[in-house]
Amino acid sequence: MMRQATMDFSTPSVFDQQRGDSSEEVDLTMVYQAASNGDVNALTAVIREDPSILECCDSEGCTPLMHAVSGRQADTVKLLLKMGANINMQDAYGRTSLCLATYLGWLEGCVSLLRNGAKHNIPDKNGRLPLHAATAEPDMRLLTVLLQQSNISEINHQDNEGMTPLHWAAFHNQPQHTQMLLKKGADPTLVDKDFKTALHWAVQSGNRILCSIILSHHQGPSIINYDDESGKTCVHIAAAAGFSDIIHELARVPECNLQALDVDDRTPLHWAAAAGKAECVQSLLELGMDSNLRDINESTPLAYALYCGHTACVKLLSQESRTEPTRPPPSQSSRPQKKERRFNVLNQIFCKNKKEEQRAHQKDPSRDRYREEDTSEVNDIITTFDSIVGTNCQEQPGDQVAMVEFKKKTSDNSKYLLPEKKPLARKGLPPIRTQSLPPITLGNNFLTASHRATSHAGLSSAPHHMAQRSQKSRSEQDLLNNRTGCQMLLDNPWKSDSNQVFSYKVWTVSSSDKLLDRLLSVRPGHQEVSVPPHLRHLHNPSSGQNFQHLSPNRHKIRDLPFTRNNLAPLPDQKFLSGEPLRTNRVLPAIPSQRRHSTAAEESEHSANPTSDEN
């Protein structure tokens, strides 16, 4: 009984089946190795025993034919094709044997597969044809072979990223491939999913010859102002990347708009200044670009150059601002306007008296004989200030002289002047001495809203939207602020607001100034002049509101964190695989308040408590 109860292991069991499965896996592995290594004899013997091995796939869906292509085994490929291998079978990524051969740049294998009936119009899971992959290879023959088999629709086929073979040729910096595709009918006006044309990618590659090839196409000039998803044109990309030679190449096209605006109203000059590309800044200025255009933050290119600390760009932009001529308003006469002096009001009064006497003298010359010299104190005052007013007593346009009549009181006391009808409207302002731009340091980034010169007529108009021509350094402003106590002690008719910066002459009062103060019994209202703010961030006013200049004594100032915008959001991979592709070039970071959260602002505010004291 005990013998019958013993278990019999001689019969086949599950272990024997598993052992058989493992042996089959080992056989397939040997087949794949023989195909990739070119072992024709071993591969032939195995396939003769079981022809179904030709259709077997590994974990990635690759057949023995694909392994032979990966190993660049031409004889093995021919053998497998003769034995009946499926030439158009796709792997797990949708790639055929021809697609793999093209990715590898294997010209002999591609020719062999095409001659044996391989289809060149089967896209992979990324939507790319073998023609897309051929643009990455420096050998032109591979692309030429595929173009001979392709029609127009296949040449302009767009992958899942919306990129055509022409896009990829420009992306891979292949001028000859680009020229060949254009000759075969590639459309340069097609855009990818980011609204980029092939010219955008050519500009990013930094190859001027490649850009000129696309622009020489009959449709090239029509795409020069195409903007991508962020509103950037080819000029924006060239300026941000520092390709000044490409900027000149693009500017040769008459349709090129050098002052195109992106979604944040930034010009190419804004991006060049923010990126610190001095050569591009100089090139754009030489091409006549306006340096005073503002973006949505009311910031000029000079403001971004100051903010980012690019001194070379600051010098170029500040020189451009200083060399701009001050143009009078259209209503003014064409005669050059005279500068407003401190004694301009008194000068207009006395000059009017002189002109009236000159006109009367011209009408009646005989009056000169019997006329006695006027020894009044008014004439003494005229003589005293002749040396000060200089040439201001020359004839001025009649519409610029205030028509005010005065009553003269003849008494032994000192004479004074009173307005008869209305107060005298002062047209000038005390002189504001322009200073050079402040030095750029890491801890002191000044912003200036604008450096455009404004005439005195413009200062008398309603709300100001532009700052003064230049801006004092912080040390000099502190020095002037310490003198405000002395200013309040002076009985000065030109009393200014605490935010206004005057020249050094305002702080010293002579005897002639005191005499002038006694003469002006009715003081005209003072007009305020906004001073460029010393801000460490770019102010972004809400939409629909005018830009207002902030006082230097503002209590709360928030620093904006830097943000970066990727210039090439395409997948980065070797042989154009499914992994995301990255580019080396990133556009400069210009802070924008559109994407900043409140938490980020509060954290930046707490990290920089000293900025609130400014």
Curated annotation (Swiss-Prot):
Pfam families: Ank (PF00023), Ank_2 (PF12796). Residues 354-373 have a biased composition (Basic and acidic residues). The modification Phosphoserine is found at residue 475. The keyword Repeat applies. InterPro entries: Ankyrin_rpt (IPR002110), Ankyrin_rpt-contain_sf (IPR036770). Residues 1-20, 319-339, 354-375, 454-476, 564-614 are annotated as: Disordered. Keywords: ANK repeat, Phosphoprotein, Repeat. ANK repeats lie at residues 26-55, 60-89, 93-125, 126-157, 161-190, 194-223, 230-260, 264-293, 297-326. PROSITE patterns: ANK_REP_REGION, ANK_REPEAT. Residues 7-16 have a biased composition (Polar residues). It comes from the Eukaryota. This is Ankyrin repeat domain-containing protein 55. It comes from Homo sapiens. The gene is ANKRD55.
